[in-house]
Amino acid sequence: MPGRRIIAIWFPYMGTERILRKTQHSLGKPVVVVAKKSQSEIISSISAAAQYKGLFVGQSLRDASAICPNLFVQTQNSYAETQFLKGICRWSSKFSPWVATEGNNGLIMDITGCSHLFGGEDKMITHILLAYDELGLTTKIGCADTVGAAWALSRYSETVSYTHLTLPTTEAV
């Protein structure tokens, strides 16, 4: 009997892409979302353009503004971000009935028994990537036998958008 198959979906720019969808702002201009931490404003989400300029999550807005003076800055709205992710989670149930939010910028999806409906695991993942792309969301997907492995692949794999891992069975070990 085949084991469970889990997909972890990470939206690395979710905070800024939510803003970009709402404001119809130019994709080429660096965008950051900032949160108040103590006496300073810290970047909580960046756009791909901001990352290209050398900005990173956790950086102070003061430092980021010195590096990139033409930043488009928005204040973080945690409630709106949470509701946005919950909406994506509900929408994603068209791929699998077992979808849950993971943190503030990811989903976990159990695709055991579902992938054949899309023509196999690889085709299902391609379908998911294209669907999120149509929504204007950047995604990295990891697929593995366990939640932890899928999560790690989605965040730390060197591939651009999709990584895949099948753990050896006990018979193979």
Give the label of every model feature segment.
Residues N70, T169-T170:
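A very general structural signal that marks isolated residues within well-ordered alpha-helical segments
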Residues T163-T169:
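Conserved small/polar residues in nucleotide/adenosyl-binding loops
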Residues C143-S157:
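Short, conserved secondary-structure transition motifs
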Residues M1-I108, G113-S115, G120-L130, T139-C143, ...:
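Residues that scaffold, gate, or flank divalent-cation-dependent active/transport sites
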